[in-house]
C-alpha cells in the first residue's frame, strides 16, 4: 500500500491528530514540517539548521527555497519510500509545484490533497478551549480532552495555561490568514483533480474512515 498525501485545513482542524492516527493504522509516516524545523534548529553542526535558526530568530519568514530543501531532505529518507502524510506543507503554490517536481524525479506523484473543512466558529471553540501544561508541555482541551482536576495537569499538578496563539482574537486572525494564504494551494490541487474534501466536524473516527476510503486502504 503506497499513499502520498498532503493534509490541508485551518488551524484547529485536527490535521496532526488525524495524521498520527493514520500513521498508527497504516504505517505511513506523518511528516510535520513544524516538527522538522524544531529538530533541525537543535542540531549544532547542521548548516541548513543554522541558517534557518538565524532567520527565525530575526522573526522573519523562512524563504521557500530553504523550506523546500528541508522537506526534500526529509522525504528522501527511507521511511518515505512507500508514502508520507505531509502536514504543514505546502503553504504556497510555489511549494506545491516544487513538491510535484521533486516527486516526479522519484517517479512518484501525490495520491491526494485532503482538505479538512471546519467552519470558523468551530475552530474558535476548539482552540480557545485548548490549554497546555507549562511544565511538561502536555496539551488538553477543556471541552474534548479535559484534565481530571479543574485546569490542573494530570501529571504535574501544575495550573494549565492558555497560549497567546489560542486567544479568540488571535484565532480569528489566524483563520482569516489561513483562508487568504491557502486558497491558491486548494485551487491548485482542485485543478489537478486530486483535492478531496472531508468534513472536519464529524468526529475523529468518521474522519479517519473517510481518509482511509480516499486512499483505498484495506486491512484485510
UniProtKB/Swiss-Prot annotation:
<dbReference type="InterPro" id="IPR006259">
    <property type="entry name" value="Adenyl_kin_sub"/>
</dbReference>
<dbReference type="GO" id="GO:0008270">
    <property type="term" value="F:zinc ion binding"/>
</dbReference>
<dbReference type="GO" id="GO:0005737">
    <property type="term" value="C:cytoplasm"/>
</dbReference>
<dbReference type="Pfam" id="PF00406">
    <property type="entry name" value="ADK"/>
</dbReference>
<dbReference type="InterPro" id="IPR000850">
    <property type="entry name" value="Adenylat/UMP-CMP_kin"/>
</dbReference>
<dbReference type="GO" id="GO:0005524">
    <property type="term" value="F:ATP binding"/>
</dbReference>
<comment type="subunit">
    <text>Monomer.</text>
</comment>
<feature type="binding site">
    <location>
        <begin position="139"/>
        <end position="140"/>
    </location>
    <ligand>
        <name>ATP</name>
    </ligand>
</feature>
<feature type="binding site">
    <location>
        <position position="163"/>
    </location>
    <ligand>
        <name>AMP</name>
    </ligand>
</feature>
<feature type="region of interest" description="LID">
    <location>
        <begin position="129"/>
        <end position="166"/>
    </location>
</feature>
<protein>
    <recommendedName>
        <fullName>Adenylate kinase</fullName>
        <ecNumber>2.7.4.3</ecNumber>
    </recommendedName>
</protein>
<comment type="pathway">
    <text>Purine metabolism; AMP biosynthesis via salvage pathway; AMP from ADP: step 1/1.</text>
</comment>
<dbReference type="Pfam" id="PF05191">
    <property type="entry name" value="ADK_lid"/>
</dbReference>
<feature type="binding site">
    <location>
        <position position="153"/>
    </location>
    <ligand>
        <name>Zn(2+)</name>
    </ligand>
</feature>
<feature type="binding site">
    <location>
        <position position="156"/>
    </location>
    <ligand>
        <name>Zn(2+)</name>
    </ligand>
</feature>
<feature type="binding site">
    <location>
        <begin position="12"/>
        <end position="17"/>
    </location>
    <ligand>
        <name>ATP</name>
    </ligand>
</feature>
<feature type="binding site">
    <location>
        <position position="95"/>
    </location>
    <ligand>
        <name>AMP</name>
    </ligand>
</feature>
<dbReference type="InterPro" id="IPR027417">
    <property type="entry name" value="P-loop_NTPase"/>
</dbReference>
<dbReference type="GO" id="GO:0004550">
    <property type="term" value="F:nucleoside diphosphate kinase activity"/>
</dbReference>
<dbReference type="GO" id="GO:0044209">
    <property type="term" value="P:AMP salvage"/>
</dbReference>
<dbReference type="GO" id="GO:0005829">
    <property type="term" value="C:cytosol"/>
</dbReference>
<feature type="binding site">
    <location>
        <position position="130"/>
    </location>
    <ligand>
        <name>ATP</name>
    </ligand>
</feature>
<dbReference type="InterPro" id="IPR007862">
    <property type="entry name" value="Adenylate_kinase_lid-dom"/>
</dbReference>
<feature type="binding site">
    <location>
        <begin position="88"/>
        <end position="91"/>
    </location>
    <ligand>
        <name>AMP</name>
    </ligand>
</feature>
<feature type="binding site">
    <location>
        <position position="202"/>
    </location>
    <ligand>
        <name>ATP</name>
    </ligand>
</feature>
<feature type="binding site">
    <location>
        <begin position="60"/>
        <end position="62"/>
    </location>
    <ligand>
        <name>AMP</name>
    </ligand>
</feature>
<keyword id="KW-0963">Cytoplasm</keyword>
<comment type="function">
    <text>Catalyzes the reversible transfer of the terminal phosphate group between ATP and AMP. Plays an important role in cellular energy homeostasis and in adenine nucleotide metabolism.</text>
</comment>
<keyword id="KW-0547">Nucleotide-binding</keyword>
<dbReference type="InterPro" id="IPR033690">
    <property type="entry name" value="Adenylat_kinase_CS"/>
</dbReference>
<keyword id="KW-0862">Zinc</keyword>
<feature type="binding site">
    <location>
        <position position="136"/>
    </location>
    <ligand>
        <name>Zn(2+)</name>
    </ligand>
</feature>
<feature type="binding site">
    <location>
        <position position="33"/>
    </location>
    <ligand>
        <name>AMP</name>
    </ligand>
</feature>
<feature type="binding site">
    <location>
        <position position="133"/>
    </location>
    <ligand>
        <name>Zn(2+)</name>
    </ligand>
</feature>
<feature type="binding site">
    <location>
        <position position="38"/>
    </location>
    <ligand>
        <name>AMP</name>
    </ligand>
</feature>
<dbReference type="GO" id="GO:0009123">
    <property type="term" value="P:nucleoside monophosphate metabolic process"/>
</dbReference>
<keyword id="KW-0479">Metal-binding</keyword>
<dbReference type="GO" id="GO:0004017">
    <property type="term" value="F:adenylate kinase activity"/>
</dbReference>
<keyword id="KW-0808">Transferase</keyword>
<keyword id="KW-0545">Nucleotide biosynthesis</keyword>
<keyword id="KW-0418">Kinase</keyword>
<comment type="similarity">
    <text>Belongs to the adenylate kinase family.</text>
</comment>
